[in-house]
């Protein structure tokens, strides 16, 4: 089973995205963390196949979480940064190679990229 850690302070968004993943990709297990400080402990305590991190959160931004995760051994190519900002801003902030992807979480076109990532993880977990 592929394990995903979804870190975002917007509970409505995390509930929606986790529900979508559970319905569409049954071999993927989603853990939600709405508090970035609590996420630090989860990152240290468990191994994840994918992390989805919101860029803008109170107390700690997503880039600090990205740095912490990679320092504790998480492969940067298993981390996706999500934001409500425009793509150009995001790509300037996180140049290619910083992480697997930097996506606007509200743009429908960006959903296709997430679906490709989820589909790949589902296949690695033994699914169709």
Give the label of every model feature segment.
Residues 41, 63-74:
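Short amphipathic alpha-helix used as the core "switch/output" element in two-component signaling
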Residues 57:
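Receiver (REC) domain active-site loop signature in two-component systems and cognate sites
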Residues 46-52:
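Active-site beta3 strand of CheY-like receiver
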Residues 8, 54:
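Active-site residues of response regulator receiver
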Residues 11-31:
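Two-component/phosphorelay signaling modules centered on CheY-like receiver
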Residues 18, 32-41, 62:
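Helix N-cap/capping motif at the beta->alpha junctions
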Residues 81-83:
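Hydrophobic/aromatic residues positioned on beta-strands within the core alpha/beta folds
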Residues 64, 85-103, 107-115:
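Alpha4 helix (beta4-alpha4-beta5 surface) of REC/receiver domains from two-component response regulators
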């Amino acid at each position: 089973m592929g394990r995903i850690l979804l870190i975002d302070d917007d509970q409505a968004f995390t509930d929606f995205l986790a529900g979508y993943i559970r319905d569409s990709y049954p071999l993927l297990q989603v853990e939600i963390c709405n508090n970035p400080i609590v996420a630090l402990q989860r990152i240290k305590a468990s191994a994840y196949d994918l992390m989805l991190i919101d860029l803008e959160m109170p107390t700690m931004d997503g880039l600090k979480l990205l740095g912490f995760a990679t320092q504790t051994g998480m492969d940067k190519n298993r981390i996706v940064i999500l934001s409500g900002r425009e793509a150009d801003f995001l790509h300037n902030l996180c140049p290619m190679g910083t992480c697997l992807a930097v996506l606007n979480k509200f743009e429908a076109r960006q959903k296709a990229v997430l679906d490709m990532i989820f589909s790949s993880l589902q296949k690695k977990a033994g699914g169709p």
